[in-house]
Amino acid sequence: MVLSSADKNNVKACWGKIGSHAGEYGAEALERTFCSFPTTKTYFPHFDLSHGSAQVQAHGQKVADALTKAVAHINDLPNALSDLSDLHAYKLRVDPVNFKFLSHCLLVTLACHHPEEFTPAVHASLDKFFSAVSTVLTSKYR
């Protein structure tokens, strides 16, 4: 999915407003994913998946950091996320559908925390961006 200039601007503006809350929102989105899609828990058998656990918070920060990197390199996602793509494809072997689940939960989390900025245009741009990130992360599965 190709991101237009308007999409890129919407993503950068929205992510800029998230600022220091990115890790917190990443953890909240993970918790939502685990609650809404329980099969995703199978990838984290060694984690304490309870609300507010330090392990979920730390992984939420990793998700946020990866997305922050993706936003910073929005014109070159494949190179920016190459190492992460390798990790998920060859070592972790995460089912690609789980990226869609997490993307949905990220959208819900952002909409809850920033309803005034979460316009239909921003929603569509973020959805396209998360889809593009998911596509890159699953590109090496073939």
UniProtKB/Swiss-Prot annotation:
Domain Globin spans what residues? 2-142
Sites where Phosphoserine occurs are at S4, S36, S50, S103, S125, S139
Annotated GO MF terms: haptoglobin binding; heme binding; iron ion binding; organic acid binding; oxygen binding; oxygen carrier activity; peroxidase activity
For this UniProt record, the keywords arranged alphabetically read as follows: Acetylation, Heme, Iron, Metal-binding, Oxygen transport, Phosphoprotein, Transport
- Which InterPro entries does its entry note? Globin (IPR000971), Globin-like_sf (IPR009050), Globin/Proto (IPR012292), Hemoglobin_a-typ (IPR002338), Hemoglobin_oxygen_transport (IPR050056), Hemoglobin_pi (IPR002339)
Q: What does this gene product do?
A: Involved in oxygen transport from the lung to the various peripheral tissues.
Q: What is the annotated quaternary arrangement, including any partners?
A: Heterotetramer of two alpha chains and two beta chains.
**Family affiliation:** Belongs to the globin family.
Would you tell me the protein name for this molecule?
Hemoglobin subunit alpha
Q: Which gene encodes it?
A: HBA
